[in-house]
Amino acid sequence: KVDIRKLETYSQDDPDAYSYSGGLCLANQGLLEFVEMFKAPIKVLHPLLTATQEGNYNGTEGLSALPFSGIILAHSNESEWVGFRNNRNNEAFLDRVFIVKVPYCLRVSEEIKIYRKLLSNSDLHAAPCAPGTLEMMAQFSVLSRIQEPENSSVYSKMRVYDGESLKDTDPKAKSYQEYRDAAGVDEGMTGLSTRFAFKILSRVFNFDAT
């Protein structure tokens, strides 16, 4: 877009009058984060085609192509990506997208740390909490995300994922790598979200200690 303050000196199609404030302008030779990319209208995504393929894109005014050299990092939910991928009108984008799957947390101890961080930044930081509440919520969430193994207990699998050694207590328990190899790459992509778990905690928290 044009910087209105500079129109007194330059014409509208002069490069010096252009306001280089867009995402691609600011992220040139850097990293551009695109939040919820696949919810955006297709017209918004068009500049990304030439920016990623040819290293330039057209601005909103009558200027020559602007250079771009950087990385575009977009994140989205699985369902939105599947809908975008299945639309044949988006074939030009699919060849330029590299998928990095980010599963939910599969370690109970790390899930608890996430809850504590969320609670410390909320109005519930001073509210009383019964012992074991966060541990139970974390175990419930992680159990919903991991795949049930064959010839072994899913509870033992959860404990192994958390770094425990069960050789002396559960002879059927497998190693961490054996569980991961059997589960495949999609483990952790489904199940209860951390956002949902925090909503549950916010509802059951005891606001009144008396």
Question: How should these model regions be labeled?
Answer:
Residues K1-T210:
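Conserved ASCE/P-loop NTPase catalytic core
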